[in-house]
Amino acid sequence: MAAPTLTTDGPRLGQQEMKKMSPSFHPTLWGDFFLSYEAPTEAQEAEMRQRAEVLREEVRNMIKGSHDVPEIVDLIITLQRLNLDYHYEDEINEKLAVVYNSNYDGGNLDLVSRRFYLLRKCGYHVSSDVFLNFKDQYGNFIEVDTRSLLSLYNAAYLRIHGETVLDEAISFTTRCLQDRLEHLESPIAEEVSSALDTPLFRRVGTLEMKDYIPIYEKDAKQNKSILEFAKLNFNLLQLLYSSELKECTTWWKELRVESNLSFVRDRIVEVYFWMSGGCYDPQYSHSRIILTKIVAFITILDDTLDSHANSYESMQLAEAVERWDESAVSLLPEYMKDFYMYLLKTFSSFENELGPDKSYRVFYLKEAVKELVREYTKEIKWRDEDYVPKTLKEHLKVSLISIGGTLVLCSAFVGMGDVVTKKIMEWVMSDAELVKSFGIFVRLSNDIVSTKREQREKHCVSTVQCYMKQHELTMDEACEQIKELTEDSWKFMIEQGLALKEYPIIVPRTVLEFARTVDYMYKEADKYTVSHTIKDMLTSLYVKPVLM
């Protein structure tokens, strides 16, 4: 469906309406910081890389030399949590096959839970019936040690629909761990506290890497080579991330947001963190940069159409995006022109960077942006007509696209290497069930934390308000029930990811990685809009190296 056709020969009905009052977002917390950030000298970095390479081979030999299933499971989970696993994909895949073909369904709940967690996380469809062995004659879970409870708790969050035993395991372990928490000592106390806040499976990989290093350092069973390698790897990744932040900040500064688009959230560092959480391994540098630029554009579009432009200007912008041509700039009010031209210029640069063999991917990216803006215009119509969709299903027909989930996934795959094919790009754009479940999860998570804030201004009705009207609930009641729907979305995403066998594992893995970043950014507050809440975390991730 094309955007409404406009002309430039004067105002039409609605053009003279007063410009909306934009909400006041706090200014950037970072400014030019990463433009002048001083990295270690080349000699220092070379020394770090040389030592890291020695340690990398030591750890590789540990993996190859591991034979017992308990040893293999513990080692791989440790490497995953420290973000070292990407160094050893082939070796780990060989060991996963050993673990999968083993028969561990008996007495050791800790091992059974960790084996289940590891295999399901890595795409193996293992049965949850194994946990029935740990119930008594009345169907209740048997009380066990805290470490086993924690392992069961983390395993249970990889549940899919119909796995009642895992639903029950979450209720049981949550209650037990909460009761025991105040009596625990370090380091398991920190582990339990972190898990109760965010189960292991749902944690953002870069944050888990940062947070787990000090916990692993306190572990009596820690391996000194693994620990040293984890610290060096973190610091080397920090150098890479900081250089990418410098590139993204330079690109963002050229748009002169503070003068041309002062009503927009100036959050380029926060965007980078959010998007890099979905593909944080070093080989995905191009994806991270493309993602950061795309979501910066989404932010501009969202803040312009939702909070600043009047309805006529919004339709002008929608028409220009639909045309995707420099000549369409004549449609736009003055304050939109530079942004629009920069949008076209940036997409042209994507095509040049990808080269003749991969530039076809940018076509899908353009189509995803156009689709996003089309759905924005439908929401603007809802807002202007004070229309409330009758059901959540009706709302989601529009809003699961307008939240940008499809565009984010498309952006991630555009920048990846040869593993991404035309078939994968078409799958992302085809309304696939996994993509749809992800979009619903993003939309509901966003609306739970943003609805109350947005009531201060006239906004399109959210899924929360729609659900309130549909089921005659208060806002708090609706939010609680929608939280249950987000849990349902997790089950769908895991289920659909396990079933997606015709594509490389990186496809479902990327979707789930982005779900983790969404979960973090919208847990309890909108950390993107109110980014003071994550300033210290970002400093520890991108500025302060880990002490060796």
UniProtKB/Swiss-Prot annotation:
Binding-site positions, Mg(2+) 3: 446, 450, 454
UniProt-annotated binding residues for Mg(2+) 2: 302, 306
Tissue: Expressed in roots. Not detected in leaves, unless damaged by herbivory or infected by fungi.
Induction profile: Up-regulated by herbivory and fungi (e.g. Fusarium spp., C.heterostrophus, F.verticillioides, R.microsporus and A.parasiticus).
Known EC number: 5.5.1.17, 4.2.3.113, 4.2.3.55, 4.2.3.15
Bound cofactor: record note: Binds 3 Mg(2+) or Mn(2+) ions per subunit.
Compartment(s) where it occurs, according to its Swiss-Prot or TrEMBL record: Cytoplasm
Alphabetized UniProt keyword annotations: Cytoplasm, Isomerase, Lyase, Magnesium, Manganese, Metal-binding, Plant defense
BP GO annotations: defense response to fungus; diterpenoid biosynthetic process; terpenoid biosynthetic process
Single GO MF descriptor: myrcene synthase activity
Family from the record: Belongs to the terpene synthase family.
Purpose of the protein: Involved in the biosynthesis of the bicyclic sesquiterpene (S)-beta-macrocarpene. Can use both geranyl diphosphate and farnesyl diphosphate as substrate, but not geranylgeranyl diphosphate. Produces mainly (S)-beta-macrocarpene, but also smaller amounts of beta-bisabolene and (E)-beta-farnesene when used with farnesyl diphosphate as substrate. In the presence of geranyl diphosphate, produces the acyclic monoterpenes beta-myrcene and linalool along with minor amounts of the cyclic compounds limonene, alpha-thujene, sabinene and alpha-terpinolene. May be involved in plant defense.
Note: Tyr-522 is involved in the initial isomerization of the (E,E)-nerolidyl cation to its (Z,E)-isomer.
Quaternary assembly: Monomer.
Protein's UniProt name: (S)-beta-macrocarpene synthase
Organism encoding this protein: Zea mays
